[in-house]
Amino acid sequence: MASISDDGMALSGNLKKLKTMKKKFFVLYEETSTSSARLEYYDTEKKFLQRAEPKRVIYLKNCFNINRRLDTKHRFVIVLSSRDGGFGIVLENENDLRKWLDKLLVLQRNIANSNGTAHSPYDQVWQVVIQKKGISEKVGITGTYHCCLTSKSLTFVCIGPEKTPNGEDRVASIEILLTTIRRCGHASPQCIFYVELGRQSVLGSGDLWMETDNAAVATNMHNMILSAMSAKTESNTNLINVYQNRPDLSHEPMRKRSSSANEASKPINVNVIQNSQNSLELRSCSSPHNYGFSRERCDSLPTRNGTLSESSNQTYFGSNHGLRFNTISGIRPHSTNKHSNSPTFTMPLRCSESEDSSISVDESDDNGSFSHYRLNTRTSETAIPEENIDDFASAEFSKVTEPNESDENYIPMNPVNPTDAIHEKEKADLQRLEDASLHFNFPEHASEKLAKDFDLDSDNQCCRPIRAYSIGNKVEHLKFNKRLGHLNDTGQNPNRVRAYSVGSKSKIPRCDLQRVVLVEDNKHEFASNRSQSSIGKEGSSYGSSANRQKKSTSAPLLSLKNQINSDRMSDLMEIDFSQATNLEKQKFIKNNEIPKYIENVFPKAPRTDSSSLTLHATSQKDIFNGSKLNNTAITSEDGYLEMKPVGNGYTPSSNCLPIKVEKLKLSDYQTTAPPLLTATAAPVQDLNKISTYNISAEKWREQPSRSEEKKSNSPLNDNPFSLKPTNVESKSKSHDVHSANQIDCEKVCVQSDKLNNLTDKIVENNNLDIGGHEEKKLVHSISSEDYTQIKDKANDFTKFNEAGYKILQIKSDSSLISSKLYQKGMHKDNLERTHRLTESVNTIPDNATATVGSSSLTKFNINSVKPAADSRSTGTDPSTAQNILQIKDLNFPSRSSSRISQPELHYASLDLPHCSGQNPAKYLKRGSRESPPVSACPEDGNTYARIDFDQSDSSSSSSNIFNT
């Protein structure tokens, strides 16, 4: 080895070049005034002595890293990394390696110090070739790079020019944090190493594929980078690694990843760090120089105050010792922290506290004595009780004697009796200490006000440290006062409460709410409590919210469990679909005085002051609108559909059925009366469009022949009708037709039981619709057994000039099948239907006129009609079948009319088709099976009926009804 000359030569010797493993003569020069520090090598020592040109000169100022390389098959290798590439030197032994490496590092540090730059060496440096794959070409990082590893990041340094031969720019240097690397791996046969980056990396998400010199380098890169990613501790400096001869960092403990489990599931750390001379500062060991401590990522703890027995890796302080230590449960040294110094609170698990969601080990650097609380690093205060301190029993301080301990700051965990006066002095002293810490200086909120708010209930605070609430909020003090019997008013106590879900705060059964809360305040009103809003009706207010004036809050205050508060549901919307009580129904029925001898489905309503009993052919919307305008006594139950079973003794609900079932005056049906039905629906020329019953206009003009012959033999021939042809185009005669069409069914009061039985079975066709509807409608069958009448007390009806009730029963049978209007081949079926129709149907002439005396009533003449098919077959005049209603799409279901054999019926209100003003139809009395629905409500078109959903069959329906 040559000696150091005057030109600054420091070391020289025959070493091997890593790439070729050939011996070369290397000379290391220090920095001089004329030249900088450099490393030169020659082919032989002879050429060096001959002052020949060196084969290569490496300036140390261009080397960004000099370290030992451990990934080759040679043990003692030093690598100098620069922008021109890496240069490796293979030495013969460890001593030579340390001598050359130390000298190189000293010269490098001197250069960095002279330039005023900080030298940050890399732990590992590999030379790789990044392939054009993944995101490399997108971000411009392709070609030969140095892959430099540190404890925090992975840096790629460009080798060679910063432009590709194609003229594309290359990234000179880029640093990727290890925390943004999702995974890494290698392929041994192909010498490929890849890294998958996450979205938070500087390059974005994607893969980087790089090629190494050999498979050993790829394996070493994988192990080193993965160990650095998961290592718990930082790697040491290169110099320490070199002198300790540590091949890699794989033996280091793995770094703990972030965990969401609780402390009970975490492994126990048995390392107890103590220092009896000075208090140690515990910090997160992210610095590479903190060799004694391990770095941990933040752990997601349960969001509540943890007790000392379940918390690990936290800092505790002893009041008599100036040191800190990191410990866990079960290994706490008894000499430094006593068992009595555990101010833990038992908090309910349902409550959460955001300030203890994660535990930090960063503490202050003071060396004074500390209290026995587990310090919370996010606030300046000490341990904080839960915000709902009323969920557990309030505690007071009790005196616990302990040697060398002060009793002022001790917090016992014993329950206390609020009425005990022994500890009043201790509470007063502690309250003064607590008031001393209340120093608030906010511009919007005076400190006196906040101090007063915290002093509302000193006993409930339990003399514990005050919670750091946000500005303007207060502590809840209600439950403790309620236990003492002092229930604060809602408006005067705007304390902070917890929000509850809908219905969760109701402490009494729902039936009690209906009986007490909803009905007790309004015993004489029949409107139920819907949505707690006032239903305006002539200025009156319904429901229990009528007397409320306080505005509901978003989080209502809780009340006592044994007290029914009228404001319990003040902030919630509750819809009550229950019916009124039976007592209310009985009162309502008694006030309206419904006759007992009438089988009612609809309640009686008082007669309003209307000008005339005009029948309106309106829609369902007009019916309900008219009922609202004409009668202001409608309850809030009008829209309900009563579906309860009806028996003999059943009284329907008075709140769920529409009112406006008016009694008919006998004088309204006189022939001299003005017309009662106004033609407003359809023109005259549309007479043939009558719902699904296509009745031609010529049929209405035919002279009745057979009905006149049967008229004299009718048992109701007291007041015969004048049978005249009806001219539908004449206005005056149209009024006569309409007046005849308005007569629903007069209730005849006679002494003969036969007459009563006959008039009980009269059915009239009042539902012919000329509104132009060509759509098919469901054909219903009407049983006249449901037409009820007043069997006695005729004097009462004559006195009040009223007619009785009439109830329709519409029997909807599944056998009623409607076919198309213009279906072919229906002539034969129509003949059969007409034959069946005329055998049991009695008709009434067009113009039914009668004179109503002061003491007599109008009686209908029921005429027996022979089958129309017979008249056609024998060649009789077609006028003999003048009033037979031709029905196209009608099947005839059988229905039993026996009241005793009927099953239990379910009733509902039904809006039936109505008659228009141009209806020229006579009141055709037909059998129950063939009759369409008939209007039952005289004044405003309210047509209601009972619906029988029974599917039973009986063929004796019409015969039982019309057996005269």
Swiss-Prot record:
GO terms for cellular component: cell cortex; cytoplasm; cytosol; intracellular membrane-bounded organelle; nucleus; plasma membrane. Residues 249-268, 527-560, 698-735, 921-964 are annotated as: Disordered. One of its GO terms (biological process) is multicellular organism growth. Residues 698-712 have a biased composition (Basic and acidic residues). The modification Phosphotyrosine is found at Y410, Y907, Y944. A motif (YXXM motif 2) lies at residues 640-643. Keywords: Differentiation, Growth regulation, Oogenesis, Phosphoprotein, Repeat. The modification Phosphoserine is found at S286, S287, S342, S554, S928, S931. A motif (YXXM motif 1) lies at residues 410-413. GO terms for molecular function: insulin receptor binding; insulin-like growth factor receptor binding; phosphatidylinositol 3-kinase binding. Bindings to phosphatidylinositol 3-kinase and SHP2. This is Insulin receptor substrate 1. The gene is chico.
